Amino acid sequence: MVPRITKMEVFPVAGRDCMELNLSGAHAPYFTRNVVVLTDSSGLLGVGEVPGGEKITKALLDSIDLVAGTSVGEYKNTLVRVKEQLDRSVAEDVRGNQTFDQRTGVHVLTAIEAPLLDLLGKYLE
């Protein structure tokens, strides 16, 4: 039986940033990231991470109910449901001036897709 997602956790993290290694340039001496951890019904963990920020964190937290309980094998359907919710709730999701994409939706979908694919790969192995 294909595992189901039993839990989605979102961990905002911050740390010191080395400005010489930051592709986005010297904006601040720190970084923020959102780490998403999905647990499936087999007890396995899938992990993903994306840039931080309150909008991204809030959108991830708002997506928990759409992800929890879904089948790992139907990850594309899960992502479609999350995208539909984002399309309704995130106004003016525009690209920023920095060299990385600041659109909330792009990062939220990536933060969920990466651990789903992590779990799918473990299941198919």
Regions found by a protein language model. Name each.
Residues 1-47, 51:
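Structured beta-strand/loop patches that form or line metal/cofactor-binding pockets in enzymes
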